[in-house]
Amino acid sequence: MSAETSAFAYANTQILQMLDQHPLPELKAAAEELSQNYRALEFHKSRHPLFHLAYLAVRFPATFDVNHKVLSVIPNPQDITSFLDLGAGPGTASVAAQDTFSDLKEMTLIDSDGQFQKISRTLLESRKTKLNFEQGLIHRLKGPYPADVVSMSYVLGELDEGAQAALIQEAWTWAQKYLSLIEPGTPRGYGRILRAREQLLAKGAYILGPCPHHNGCPLTGNDWCHFSVRLQRQEYHRRLKGVSLGYEDEKYSYLILSKESVTHPKARVIRPPRSLPGRQIFDLCTSNGVLRKTLTKKDGPAFKAAKHLRLGDAWDDDSGS
């Protein structure tokens, strides 16, 4: 394998080879059942025999993009040498970690699903990283499992609140530098992120992102903090979902906590910016609450910079009103 090939590209090739071994109608039936179960929040319902392959086809690309986006927030990626993936599934977060941290030496993946663990071995074998696998329920682990970065990606929603709090505390204990939490970008998903935020701030954690402060979250009621990645659908993805649109948007909420104090931006864009004739309008999360910023041409460089703003970007300029 060439040194230039990304971990994702290698994993995607392996997934395509697995999918090619099964008829499309059977995979489509499995994908539809998977989607129905997730919409109904029935994560543990009886599964189609091709559930694991359907998950790879339907969910792996989007959850990879989210994990890669979130892990890329961590500074000095060359200093990260170990990674713990709790509730690893097929190893999506671990593949993203391989593409994010160039000097990764060791990874530990823990999941209760033996078939997913077999798949993750295949998807991750493109690197010389030492791989450790453990099969078990993540909320009943004995530990310890120390690692520079501990990741829980789309995991908390499968546990009750008591088990969530206990696992978050364990994960924070094992994290040597950072703890990464990702949940669906829904009110329920963000609710889990918010509870983890409150729990670990009380333990002395520092927020790396997305929050630009340690104050209470200013988003209340029907508003919640979430972001989005747009990914291009591959041909097999479109065929399985029966759609023609060439892309999809994956909404997510996240939190990265640090063991060390970090420098925050002044603000973060929390809603898609609007570009109007002669004006740029965007909403910011700040230490003083949510602020709507309006920039015009008279704001010069700040106005030009605002034209390129995206949801989730940091903002440090005081220009505008």
Give the predicted meaning of each segment.
Residues 176-185:
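Conserved beta-strand signature within the Rossmann-like core of class I S-adenosyl-L-methionine
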Residues 1-42:
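N-terminal auxiliary segments of SAM/dcSAM-dependent transferases
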Residues 90-103:
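Conserved SAM-binding loop of SAM-dependent methyltransferases across substrates and taxa
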Residues 79-89:
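Conserved class I S-adenosyl-L-methionine
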Residues 240-244, 248-321:
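C-terminal lobe and adjacent flexible extensions of AdoMet/dcAdoMet transferase-like proteins
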Residues 148-162:
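A short SAM/SAH-binding and catalytic strip from SAM-dependent methyltransferases
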Residues 113:
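Conserved SAM/SAH-binding beta-strand->alpha-helix loop
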Residues 46-70:
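Class I SAM-dependent methyltransferase Rossmann-like catalytic core
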